[in-house]
UniProtKB/Swiss-Prot annotation:
Function statement: Required for maturation of 30S ribosomal subunits.
Top-rank taxon: Bacteria
Organismal lineage: Bacteria, Bacillati, Bacillota, Bacilli, Lactobacillales
Record's keyword annotation contains Transmembrane: no
Location in or out of the cell: Cytoplasm
Keywords: Cytoplasm, Ribosome biogenesis
Major location category of this protein: cytoplasm
Annotated organism of origin: Lactobacillus gasseri (strain ATCC 33323 / DSM 20243 / BCRC 14619 / CIP 102991 / JCM 1131 / KCTC 3163 / NCIMB 11718 / NCTC 13722 / AM63)
Protein name: Ribosome maturation factor RimP
Family: Belongs to the RimP family.
Single GO BP term: ribosomal small subunit assembly
Segments crossing the lipid bilayer: none
Gene Ontology, cellular component aspect: cytosol
Alphabetical list of InterPro entries matching this protein: Ribosome_maturation_RimP, RimP_C, RimP_C_sf, RimP_N, RimP_N_sf
Length: 158
């Protein structure tokens, strides 16, 4: 996380938690000459609806406007949303929540000739995950060292 996203996370986390929500991620990016501050929040169980996101957006906007000095070098567009069904797996809490779920994993280097896998997360520890994947018509467990995981997210199984 950058200093800006860390500061935003520090501001948003207590606001979200006070409402029973969870801060999932913060992104501060520049796209086509425009800055965007994207904040992803969720609520367990059942998720968060658009009205709740709109209410939280107003609270967050007010708090960010009060920051002094202003941490944003340029004007930006504030976007609050749910992370969706394919939410990223970013921290240990997310990994524990993903146990037994169908996930997508992208790797820095190939394992068994592949750089991406989708399957059910069967087990994990600090060093590795065990993923049950379907190869043609058979299921196989693959052990993936966590240090080679570039990104991971929940996935929808078809």
């Amino acid at each position: 996380m950058t200093k800006v996203t860390e500061l935003v996370a520090d501001v948003v986390t207590p606001l979200a938690e006070a409402r029973g929500d969870e801060l999932v991620d913060v992104e501060y990016v520049k796209e086509k000459k425009q800055y965007y501050l994207r904040i992803y929040v969720d609520r367990r169980p059942g998720g968060i609806d658009i009205e709740e996101i709109a209410n939280l957006s107003e609270l967050v906007s007010e708090k960010l406007d009060e920051l002094d000095p202003d941490p944003f070098p340029e004007p930006y567009i504030l976007e609050l949303s749910s992370p969706g069904l394919e939410r990223p797996i970013k921290n240990e809490k997310d990994w524990e929540r993903a146990k037994g779920s169908y996930i997508h994993v992208s790797l820095y280097q190939k394992i068994d000739g592949e750089k991406t896998y989708e399957g059910t997360l069967k087990d994990l520890n600090q060093n590795q995950i065990v993923l049950e994947v379907k190869i043609k018509t058979r299921r196989k467990e693959i052990t993936i060292p966590r240090k080679v995981i570039a990104s991971s997210r929940f996935a929808v199984e078809f």
